[in-house]
From Swiss-Prot:
PROSITE patterns per the UniProt record, alphabetical: ANK_REP_REGION (PS50297), ANK_REPEAT (PS50088)
Keyword tRNA-binding tagged: no
SMART domains reported for this sequence: ANK (SM00248)
Listed Pfam families: Ank_2 (PF12796)
Segments annotated as ANK repeats: 78-106, 107-136, 138-166, 168-196
Keywords assigned: ANK repeat, Repeat
Domain of life assignment: Viruses
InterPro entries assigned to the protein according to its UniProt record, in alphabetical order: Ankyrin_rpt (IPR002110), Ankyrin_rpt-contain_sf (IPR036770)
Name of the protein this chain belongs to: Putative ankyrin repeat protein R875
UniProt xrefs under SUPFAM superfamilies: Ankyrin repeat
Length: 197
């Protein structure tokens, strides 16, 4: 029944009601985003409402280089979303955002450092495989992972050649001060020296 309404009427309804979910009920309606007068971050809306099927559809449109992508995908907003999902560790969403064009290298590889800080090893590995630099910002990733006791992240970073002794064994001391014995033990086994205060 709804698909019997002319597109012009749908545009008026959406503009009046401000309900973008009306455009998400049908793939044909989705293209009406080009015509509506609503300023909204559709990617953020789709993710917040856990509409993964819609996100899949947007990714498919991106791969097809559909012109609607230019209206609904704004790189700055993608980058903001990417940081948020690196904090929460949602690898599935991180992958979608990268496919849609989020810049994993922005702000000295902030997203990989954020994932390290929060202990999301699978997100870290994915971002590194996509070209993120775990040594950016003076090897900050290992300091953040050590400080928060994320042993698996620390082990991964060391295996990738991150310099954990760069600042007079700062990482091991921070891990020790925060009570992360397993990180301390690992770094000592790799040659770090714990400095007493």
């Amino acid at each position: 029944m709804y698909d019997k309404l002319p597109p012009e009427l749908w545009v008026k309804i959406v503009d009046y009601s401000r309900e973008i979910n009306l455009l998400l009920v049908n793939k044909n309606f989705f293209e009406l985003f080009n015509l509506v007068d609503i300023e909204i971050d559709i990617i953020d809306y789709v993710i917040e409402n856990n509409l993964i099927c819609v996100l899949n559809f947007i990714v498919a449109l991106k791969k097809l280089e559909h012109p609607i992508i230019d209206k609904i995908v704004v790189t700055d907003l993608l980058n903001k979303c990417l940081i948020g999902y690196c904090i929460s560790g949602r690898l599935d969403i991180v992958k979608y955002l990268v496919i849609l064009g989020a810049d994993i290298r922005e702000n000295d590889d902030c997203v990989v450092r954020t994932a390290c800080h929060n202990g999301h090893i699978e997100v870290v590995k994915y971002l590194v495989n996509q070209g993120a630099d775990i040594r950016a910002y003076d090897d900050d990733a290992i300091r953040l992972a050590s400080k928060n006791g994320h042993l698996y992240v620390v082990k991964y970073l060391v295996s990738q050649g991150v310099n954990f002794r760069k600042y007079n064994d700062y990482e091991i001391n921070w891990a020790s001060q925060n009570g992360h014995g397993s990180v301390v033990d690992f770094l000592v086994s790799k040659g770090a020296v714990l400095h007493e205060k």
